[in-house]
Amino acid sequence: MNSYFEQASGFYGHPHQATGMAMGSGGHHDQTASAAAAAYRGFPLSLGMSPYANHHLQRTTQDSPYDASITAACNKIYGDGAGAYKQDCLNIKADAVNGYKDIWNTGGSNGGGGGGGGGGGGGAGGTGGAGNANGGNAANANGQNNPAGGMPVRPSACTPDSRVGGYLDTSGGSPVSHRGGSAGGNVSVSGGNGNAGGVQSGVGVAGAGTAWNANCTISGAAAQTAAASSLHQASNHTFYPWMAIAGECPEDPTKSKIRSDLTQYGGISTDMGKRYSESLAGSLLPDWLGTNGLRRRGRQTYTRYQTLELEKEFHTNHYLTRRRRIEMAHALCLTERQIKIWFQNRRMKLKKEIQAIKELNEQEKQAQAQKAAAAAAAAAAVQGGHLDQ
């Protein structure tokens, strides 16, 4: 049974899973290798736990709201609880890899998977016997007696790379079975019945192991290259839904990429985002939130007492020292930055007032000069009239 209840690094890390994992994985690897493989094979990783923890140690009981649901699920599946669960773990001990049952490489009794899982694993009896009982028995016997037979043991050094490469390869097949596809194909063709399949499996193991390591190395390098290129592209062309709502669009010549990203979020387009932001500009959005989605800080309001004290201090001195600014901040329940900005604004206001006063004085002077000139002209005219008479 392939479920999360059999994995030591399962969904919640229940203590029953740790015992089942230790029993299921003891037939193929030591505890260190099984722990390293389980760290990469466990999906999803344990919540709040390190993936490199020692899985062979007995875990302490965790007080979690999920314990009751896990216990109920175990009882529902296995009936009497721990007894049936341990028996199930013993039954899958022979055909499990790293504590996990291989659902792809089941080529023993059913006679399946020529160039795929069965052949790549070296169990050629199932494929050569055309699905009969003799072929299945030959494959199982050869896998148990021959330490190199049966299902191939994935090298721990290749586990992360080959697993990533397997999932990156979209040509078909499973991440486990398609690694030894070519060697498995040769073994399945040569086996005509159960006995021939059992004899030929010894030759298939060596070829499968060589092809396994070669494919693992090649796929690992290809996986790293593909992963690096995908991360580079993702960092350069990252698009978020709020960009469309805000009317912003990254400069990318490939418009189809942007359209595909927008389509997966309900068909949002840049034009729709602009119309949406314009329609909400004057109706639903508050004053402190702009049309482009950026927060705009509101004006700081001061009480009458704070304004009076600040005006009194400004009347005494237009510039404050650091010590005096700290004292006023504590006295008025304001921050130093607020007081500093208030004094800056007050000095600018005073400067504008002084400039306005100067302009008014100049205008008054000009008006007085014009009046004086007009009066002098009138007096000169009157004086000239008297002289003419």
Swiss-Prot record:
GO biological process, one term: midgut development
Chief site of localization: nucleus
Record carries keyword Transcription regulation: yes
Pfam families the record matches: Homeodomain
Motif, QA: chain positions: 368-383
SMART domains: HOX
Region (Disordered) residue spans: 138-189
InterPro entries: Antp_homeobox, HD, HD_metazoa, Homeobox_Antennapedia_CS, Homeobox_CS, Homeodomain-like_sf
Function text: Sequence-specific transcription factor which is part of a developmental regulatory system that provides cells with specific positional identities on the anterior-posterior axis. Binds the consensus region 5'-TTAAT[GT][GA]-3'. This homeotic protein controls development of the cells in the posterior thoracic and first abdominal segments. It activates the synthesis of the decapentaplegic (DPP) growth factor.
Name under which the protein is recorded: Homeotic protein ultrabithorax
Organism name: Drosophila melanogaster
Gene: Ubx
